[in-house]
Amino acid sequence: MRDVLGKSASDKAGESWEISGVEGDISMVQNGFLEGNSLQELTEIYMGDLLGDSIYQRFGVEFPLLLKFIDAADFLSVQVHPDDKLARERHNSYGKTEMWYIVESDQGQLIAGFNRELDREQYLQHLQEGKLKEILNYEKVAPGDIYFMPAGRVHAIGAGVLLAEIQQTSDVTYRIYDWDRTDNQGNPRELHTELALDAIDFSFHKNYKTDYQALENSTVNAVDSPFFTTSVIHLDKPVEKDYNLIDSFVIYMCMEGAVGIAYGKGEVETMKKGETVLIPAELKNLALIPTEASTLLEVYLK
């Protein structure tokens, strides 16, 4: 996290919450005349000008996305998230659909879904017999790989994987398996076996990785879902961006290089690898000016 992304974090830090409206972990403005204000305060003051009118009507002052970097030193727990309907019924919360963009991978892997057709009873049998690992789908990953994880898909991040995560604003997680780890007192971590049963999507897919074609100086759509739209932009020269046809804020996450964001009357905001910038919905035209070969993720809502 510190060496690759330049984060001022300890060696043991596993996550960097880049843009968050989650209570207790709300993002703060880092520069400009609004420096020191929270994202919550900005949504309350600027409403549709910041979020987009249609987004504000849907979510109010609650920021709808949470963006992170995650650096896994060991395999994280196998987990699943409920969809909106189940999360609302149980937790009065949104569900959690998310996506991962692999920044670096030291020969790492992740888990996405199952490796065969399954039903609820077969899943439970493997779980009860301690054979869950046999039915999980393991994927070797490389920088630039994208995985879309809809609510209901079991998943886990493996050791040596550094990734960017884009998700609905929700902290509801059902832990299924934690590799038989124990705490200092020898106690296993709490699992949510029963809660997870109604949340899991048992369907099998031949290909869990998102296919997209990387093109220079073009905006390539990779994920288009009801919860967020994410595109990949590879830059080696300036690119003009026009957002007049969308009614949403835009977020850039810099995966590689460094980029100037030019807007207004000559203003320029710079960002480098590991940094994240929120563009308000009222800003419809800007230019992306790379100072070296760069890669951005572009995120917004429809």
Task: State each model region's role.
Residues 108, 240-241, 257-262, 276:
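Short beta-strand segments in beta-sandwich/barrel cores
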Residues 112-134, 164-207, 292-302:
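Double-stranded beta-helix
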Residues 62, 70-75, 84, 105-107, ...:
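Ligand-binding loop in jelly-roll beta-barrel domains
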Residues 174-246:
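C-terminal amphipathic alpha-helical segment
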Residues 67-68, 76, 98-101, 138-139, ...:
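His/acidic/aromatic-lined binding-pocket segments of jelly-roll/cupin-type domains
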Residues 136-148, 263-283:
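Short acidic-glycine-tyrosine-enriched beta hairpin
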Residues 1-118, 178-206, 230:
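Transition-metal
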Residues 117-129, 247-260:
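Short, basic/aromatic beta-hairpin or loop at an interaction surface
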